C-alpha cells in the first residue's frame, strides 16, 4: 500500500502557548482551504468561532469554505499552533475516517516543542490523535475527555488536554463541544 506524507507543515506562531493536534488531514477533495481542519463538515472552526466571537460562522469565507486568512490570523493573535500527530500514514480506505488511518511515522514532539518555547500545553482532538501522541510520550497519563494530565518533555512540565473530536462523526451538539473547549481555554487564561 502507498504511504501518504503530511501535506501541510506545522503552523507555529512565535507566541504559541497551546499546540492543537489532530490526527491527519482528510483527502484533499474534502478541503475547503489549505489549512488545518479544512473539511467544511468539521466543526473545529465553528467551535472556536462560538467561543471567541459568539458566532459559529466567524471563520467562514462563504457557505462552502472556511477562510484560511481568518483562521491563521486568529491563531497568531491567540498563540495557537496547529499540527497533527501523524506525519506519514497509509489510508486503508479513501476517506477521512481516523479508523482507517495506519500511522507509519508519528510526530517528533521534541522537534516541534523546540520551535515553540512559550508553549505550555498540548490539546488533542480525537482518540487517534491521543493514541499516536501517547506512543511517543511514554509514561504520559491519558486524560479523560474534557480534562488534562501533566507530562514532561525536554525538561518542560506541560499540560496535555483531551478534547472531544470536532468531527461530525462524533455525535454531540456543537454547543456542547464548544463548552468543553471553552473550559480548556479558560484554564489556560486564553479567553
Where are each of the predicted segments found?
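C-terminal capping/extension of enzyme domains
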Residues: 1-10, 15, 26-28, 38-40, ...
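Short, conserved, surface-exposed binding loops centered on an aromatic residue
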Residues: 11, 72-75, 114-115
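Structural motif
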Residues: 17-18, 121
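N-terminal nucleotide-binding beta1-loop-alpha1 segment
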Residues: 20-23
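Short active-site-proximal "capping" loops at secondary-structure junctions
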Residues: 25-26, 66
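Short, surface-exposed acidic-centric catalytic microdomains
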Residues: 33-101
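Internal catalytic-core helix/loop-beta-alpha segment
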Residues: 77-136
